[in-house]
């Protein structure tokens, strides 16, 4: 029986897992500020992929759409329907915002699984998907908060703040707390799911052959897309709620 070799192999796998940790960050010093370079680099890559894909697909629009043009028209129609469902008839001005959120998060999430970030060596730390960093998800959530405050104020003016005392002033603390929990839930849900997916893959690769974690990686691609959809749907719902009233 090969009990001892198997035990040694298992212990080695557990030792490898013990070495999985959150690495150091790579910073740029600009003036008196420390800039988180890892997030900026990967975010620029994602933005370049998005802009490049759009330019290539629709640089020469045709009356009879090509495959690339068809795909982006379908994506636009999907985002438009999502915005209309959640926001209502005044959805038009918010389609670019919701679309930007959805596409950036979707491509960022998928880049973590499909792009070989880790082969690029940095002086400190390593590259990963932008949404694998809490700074990115918090920034996206704060942008969403600013958007629904702007939507409510532009529609109702200062009377927007009446929602905090409806249906009764007793609920004022809870209604105020709700505006703090929205960005928290958005940011930590997205960050936690993407980070957990990458950690699960790292642990499985350390324990078993590479072929076995592949189904988990495909599941990660699916959940990454779902997370982008959830974020965009909630962002649109919050904007619609701020324009319509307290629910």
UniProtKB/Swiss-Prot annotation:
Under InterPro entries, the record lists: ATP_syn_F0_a_bact/chloroplast, ATP_synth_F0_asu, ATP_synth_F0_asu_AS, F0_ATP_A_sf
User: Could you tell me the keywords of this UniProt record?
Assistant: ATP synthesis, CF(0), Chloroplast, Hydrogen ion transport, Ion transport, Membrane, Plastid, Thylakoid, Transmembrane, Transmembrane helix, Transport
User: At the top level of its lineage, which domain of life is listed?
Assistant: Eukaryota
Localization, per the record, is: Plastid, Chloroplast thylakoid membrane
In what way does this protein cross or attach to the membrane? Multi-pass membrane protein
Membrane-spanning regions, if any? Answer: 38-58, 95-115, 134-154, 199-219, 220-240
Question: Record's Gene3D superfamilies?
Answer: ATP synthase, F0 complex, subunit A (1.20.120.220)
What molecular functions are annotated in GO for this chain? proton-transporting ATP synthase activity, rotational mechanism
Record's Gene Ontology CC terms? chloroplast thylakoid membrane; plasma membrane; proton-transporting ATP synthase complex
- Kindly state the subunit structure of this protein: F-type ATPases have 2 components, CF(1) - the catalytic core - and CF(0) - the membrane proton channel. CF(1) has five subunits: alpha(3), beta(3), gamma(1), delta(1), epsilon(1). CF(0) has four main subunits: a, b, b' and c.
PANTHER family, A to Z: ATP SYNTHASE SUBUNIT A, CHLOROPLASTIC
Record's function text = Key component of the proton channel; it plays a direct role in the translocation of protons across the membrane.
Which HAMAP family does the record associate with it? ATP_synth_a_bact
Q: Which family does it belong to?
A: Belongs to the ATPase A chain family.
The protein's name: ATP synthase subunit a, chloroplastic
Species: Triticum aestivum (Wheat)
| Protein encoded by which gene | atpI
């Amino acid at each position: 029986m090969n009990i001892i070799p198997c035990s040694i192999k298992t212990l080695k796998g557990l030792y490898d897992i013990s070495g999985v940790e959150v690495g150091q960050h790579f910073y740029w010093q600009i003036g008196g500020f420390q800039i988180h370079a890892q997030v900026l680099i990967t975010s620029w890559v994602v933005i370049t992929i998005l802009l490049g894909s759009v330019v290539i697909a629709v640089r020469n629009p045709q009356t009879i759409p090509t495959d690339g043009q068809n795909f982006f028209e379908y994506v636009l129609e999907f985002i438009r329907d999502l915005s209309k469902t959640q926001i209502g008839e005044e959805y038009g001005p918010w389609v670019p915002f919701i679309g930007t959120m959805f596409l950036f998060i979707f491509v960022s999430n998928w880049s973590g699984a499909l792009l070989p970030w880790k082969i690029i060596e940095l002086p400190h730390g390593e590259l990963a998907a932008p949404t694998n960093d809490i700074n990115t998800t918090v920034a996206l959530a704060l942008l969403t908060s600013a958007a629904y405050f702007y939507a409510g104020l532009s529609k109702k003016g200062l009377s927007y703040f009446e929602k905090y005392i409806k249906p009764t002033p007793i609920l004022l603390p809870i209604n105020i707390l709700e505006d703090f929990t929205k960005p928290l839930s958005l940011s930590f849900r997205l960050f936690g799911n993407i980070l957990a997916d990458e950690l699960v893959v790292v642990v499985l690769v350390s324990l078993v052959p590479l072929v076995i974690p592949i189904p988990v990686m495909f599941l990660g691609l699916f959940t990454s897309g779902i997370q982008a959809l959830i974020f965009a749907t909630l962002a649109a719902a919050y904007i619609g709620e701020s324009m319509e009233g307290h629910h």
